Design a protein with these regions (language model features):
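Cytochrome P450 core scaffold surrounding the K-helix E-X-X-R motif
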Residues: 102-113
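Conserved RNA-binding domains used in RNP assembly and mRNA/RNA metabolism
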Residues: 146, 163-210
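Active-site beta-strand/loop microenvironment that shapes enzyme catalytic pockets
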Residues: 93-104
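Contiguous, small/hydrophobic- and glycine-enriched helical/loop subdomains that border
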Residues: 1-92, 111-114, 120-130, 134-137, ...
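Short linear motifs in intrinsically disordered
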Residues: 58-60, 154-161, 177-183
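Residue-level recognition of well-ordered beta-strand positions that form the cores
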Residues: 28-30, 96, 179
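Polybasic "coupling" helices that flank or enter modular domains
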Residues: 129, 143-170
């Protein structure tokens, strides 16, 4: 595991810049899972973050597909999973987790409407060390459960706030619109189009349709 309190070149999905000010919690977990468990890593990380924030700070969280953790509808944490394959085997996987803990989000007006922090929500600082310990304990519990074959998509599904709602999904140059009907055990979004057909989407940017 690699742990940092600040990043100068934080990176999110699709190579996007991730604002990583002092006061946050930024960690990368290095794993060597089997190929069949690779897709579950984002689910595991998202659930671990949500459980840790709720357990330590008492804040109610929700998840935004595919890799964001929200509080009061604003992003409080993001997850990035990358891996390297050698043939059909996983050489290693990196799960990066960034949590806005004691960051003053008002200092970043460009993201303030969309992002929040634990301190912003509580009005006080919390121990980043305690949050990191709780997060890693939850991650280990979930990871070992997944390795033992225990499904966790039901909890993930229950925490996804956009299921059952009309959404727009943008991935690359493509856009799909429809009802966010479900997610499968690999974390793919099942979208039901207006004509009744279904699309299975592995990744993309989701927004609610007005």
């Amino acid at each position: 595991m690699v742990l940092a309190g600040r990043q100068t070149a934080g990176r999110g999905r699709l190579g996007r810049f991730w604002i990583s000010p002092r006061g946050g919690l930024y960690l990368t977990v290095v794993l060597r899972p089997s190929a069949e468990h690779l897709k579950s890593l984002v689910i595991i990380a998202a659930l671990a973050v949500a459980r840790a924030i709720e357990g330590l700070a008492g804040l109610q969280t929700s998840l935004k597909w595919p890799n964001d953790v929200l509080v009061a509808g604003r992003k409080i944490a993001g997850i990035l999973s990358e891996s390297e394959l050698v043939g059909e085997n996983v050489s290693h996987a990196l799960v990066g987790i960034g949590v806005n803990v004691n960051a003053d989000m008002a200092a970043y007006p460009e993201t303030a409407p969309l992002a929040t922090s634990v301190m912003t929500e509580l009005g006080r600082e919390v121990s980043r060390e305690a949050l990191a310990a709780r997060l890693l304990n939850e991650f280990e519990t979930l990871y070992l459960a997944a390795q033992a074959g225990k499904p966790m998509d039901e909890e993930w599904r229950a925490r996804l706030g956009m299921l059952g709602k009309e959404v727009r999904v943008r991935f690359g140059e493509q856009v799909e619109e429809g009802l966010a009907e479900d997610v499968d055990s690999d974390g793919n979004l099942i979208l039901r189009r207006a004509d009744g057909s279904r699309a299975t989407i592995a990744a993309g940017d989701v927004t609610l349709r007005s």
